[in-house]
Amino acid sequence: MKKDDRVYLNHILQSVSLIEKYTEDLTEEEFLSNSLFQDATIRQIQIIGEATKNLSKSLRDKYPQVHWRGIAGMRDKLIHDYFGVDINAVWDTIKEDIPALKKIVLEIIQDLNGNP
């Protein structure tokens, strides 16, 4: 039996929170020069991608404004092309895409819970 979408959405939020925690006080230069922060955030992006892949098709179809395929594709790239990871692109994802993802996932959870 497939888990409720809220389980996977909460996994996404947990990973987003960890990424925010790991990078909140970092400059881009600090991030780019520190493999520990890179590895920690890449792992959380992988989890976000895996959770996205497990969301029901009906949920993904209901929220087409989210680039679900791109999120899952980022996970695949990080898993399968780990020697070719563009750390600058990871930083851009953290600063540009993660905040937007957090906002929409919170809205989706509210919608699923029946809260306006």
From Swiss-Prot:
| Self-association and partners | Homodimer, probably forms a complex with cognate antitoxin MA_1295.
Q: Which Pfam family is an annotated match for this chain, by its short name? A: HepT-like
Sorted UniProt keywords: Hydrolase, Nuclease, Nucleotide-binding, Phosphoprotein, Toxin-antitoxin system
| Keyword Nucleotide-binding in annotation | yes
Described by its record, this protein's role is as follows:
Probable toxic component of a putative type VII toxin-antitoxin (TA) system, probably an RNase. Probably neutralized by cognate antitoxin MA_1295. Neutralization may be due to AMPylation by MA_1295.
The UniProt entry annotates the motif RX(4)HXY motif at: 75-82
Protein name stated in the entry: Putative RNase MA_1296
